[in-house]
Amino acid sequence: MHVTAQTLPWMDPSLPPEQRASLLIAAMTLDQKVQQLHGASGGPPEIPACGTNNIRQVPAIASLKIPTFRITNGPVGIGGGDCNPQDPATALPIALALAASFDPALAFSFGSVIGNEALTLGLHELEGPGMNMAREGRGGRNFEYMGEDPILAGTMSSAEIPGIQQYGIIAMSKHFILNDQEVNRMSANVVVDDRTFHELYALPFEMTVKDGKVASIMCSYNRVNGPFACDNPYTLTTMLRGQWGFTGYVQSDFGATHSTAVSLNAGQDFEMQSGTNYSLARITAALADGSLTMATIDRALSRRYVQMFKFGIFDRPITRGQIDAVANGQIARSIAEQTAVLLKNQGDLLPLNAASIHSIALIGQSTYAAAAASGGGGSSRVVPLYTITPLQGLQNVLTSLGSTATVSLLTVPTNPTAANLAAVTAAAAGADVAIVMAGVVTSEGSDRPSLALPNNQDAIITAAIAANNPRTVLVLKDGDAVLMPWVDQVPAILEAWNPGEEDGNVVARLLFGLVNPSGKLPVTYPKLASDTPTSLVERYPGVTIGGVPTITYSERLQMGYRWYDAQGIAPLFPFGYGLSYTKFAYGPVQVTPATTDGTTPVTVQFTVQNVGTRAGADVPQIYVGFNPLIGEPPKRLVTWKKVTLNPGEQQLVTLTIDPKASSHPISTWDSPSQQWVPARGKLSVYLARSAGEIASTAFATVVFPSSGVPGDVNGDSVVNCADLSAVTLALGTRTGQAGFLPTADIDHNGVIDVRDASAVARTLPAGTRCS
């Protein structure tokens, strides 16, 4: 077909995206198709100022009106893109901080800032949000992710994605999948059982597909139970498209493509960055030997083009505008203020009373006390449009309060001498208030060597404590949990995370009570490194098996707070924990109906009252615990609500546990049948302040309905391995006991025994094999 400017039917915006993609692909030569299967170095010709030494783009094909496809990181704002030097953008708080807000509406605002700025800068694809689990606290990229709980991560990310995509920007859930550490991230084989895989690590991705409607997925570097993630037909096709119904496209991480035909056939659609495996020579060879078909190439192109047409990328010009730094900076500040977690407040030291303060000593290393902790490093690093330092923030707030207090900054070197530490003690002793700032800024490419604060910061904190100043406040600016050997000696601790460009204003407004802290920990803070679930070398950093670095998730479902619960280990600060400048009282939790078939919603109600003297927000959390025979950890978070109340105000909170939700709140993954199955038997519903503090408990019972089909225990009208699994787990139970399933009592004698299991086994379809 000879294409001219008059014969470009795919440029008709009234046509459906699928039809436009089909028309375009039909007009392309093989050379053009291959050029569009991978990224390339260069610069967007539409924006000459971006230069030519850039990597995140697919070059335009002017004759076909295919625009330059412009890609940018990342999970914490506009990171590295296809402009050199990198475009400055709003430095939001890190993603882990966002998770600490437990507020999906805030996640939407977070995504809206990113989407708005991506559109303003003429970009098309945003490589984020980051969906990996904070399984290992030393993980260098945990700052890009949403914590250790899959439902929290999935809920927050699913709220962020529409914020991004409303601006015609393609969001991308990454890194799919099990890319949970930086050590050997490009080569490791991650070994995990199927149930753990689905219930913990795949679940947040599933939620972003079903709830967030994410348009693209990035497959990761590592191997997944053998095959590389970008070569894996089970994850990329069976699970992602078959089980979840994903219709977008899959892009590789940079250099994560390890094959040509294998990856395309498995379900990868687009290679980043250079096209080593999707080169014309290799594609041609694969077509020639029959390992690859033109239909598969066209499928890969269509998946991306459909999204590009859907998001208007073919129909809008590429221009670079001016970001509204003031408006977006105010949003960034508001978000950061709602993410900080008050860990300790002995004697109600906080908020500080400006009227009683004449001098403040601001102490710490430059990264935390002299500069704004605007975020982590690596490809997601944001170049901030501006920053507010801690000193500037304190001065701004003191001025707004009419205070004339002085703030003296003492910057401590990374290798402090005895004289440096003596100066810390003297400064803390000589001021009305000592504010010590410490923390961790992590980066892609390496994990932390330990959970301890780096660069001798423990010594600085200890030196400040030695001053015996009762008004000593520690502000932590972390990218994950840290060890706190001095915790008992510090009166007040505020976890501010890496709060972004507005660091100084955020922290000062929190310390002086202009904002009441309301964040809750999205990760568990251990007392000791040996308490963590990954203290065994096979679990982290892994061992070499057959010449391949191998990480074994042998803790199985006991990840994060589930580990501490199951092992009976008391953490320093539990998941979901966070104090306030006010107090909240919870009424008893009530659950209706008391019996459910595992498909109908369960309603949870309770009251929350602000019994303090300040307005504030709290996050009551609902966890559920299952019949112990099912083999789950003691409890899992299923839902929550952020509640804002004035002093004395009370609110009736109603939450729904919907078994049909994409989070599968009361189901477990049944590997033999490859499906989610409602957890049968007694269901404990916990109203909690954190994973470590249950306020009230109620109960429900999940009973499968009878379908009338012989051997159908779970009531889905089909007899399969899930039914045999259900009756096996209920063996030994009697009528009236927790875990008894009437539908599993095949002989109706009031006890579930081997005769019932045998009866179910006999009704299985011929040839069925169950593990």
Give each language-model segment a name.
Residues M1, P588, T599, Q605-V608, ...:
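Low-complexity, intrinsically disordered short peptide segments enriched in small/polar/basic residues
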Residues M1-H2, R539-V543, D597, R734-P742, ...:
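Surface-exposed charge patches in extracellular/virion surface proteins
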Residues V3-W669, V677, L683-L687, A691:
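Glycoside hydrolase catalytic-domain context in secreted enzymes
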Residues F108, I164, T208, S359, ...:
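Residue-level detection of beta-strand scaffold positions
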Residues Q675-W676, R680-K682, A700-V702:
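A short, solvent-exposed, low-complexity linear motif enriched for acidic/polar residues
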Residues A688-V709:
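Long, low-complexity ectodomains and other extracytoplasmic segments of secretory-pathway proteins
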Residues V703-S771:
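Cellulosome-associated attachment modules in secreted, modular CAZymes
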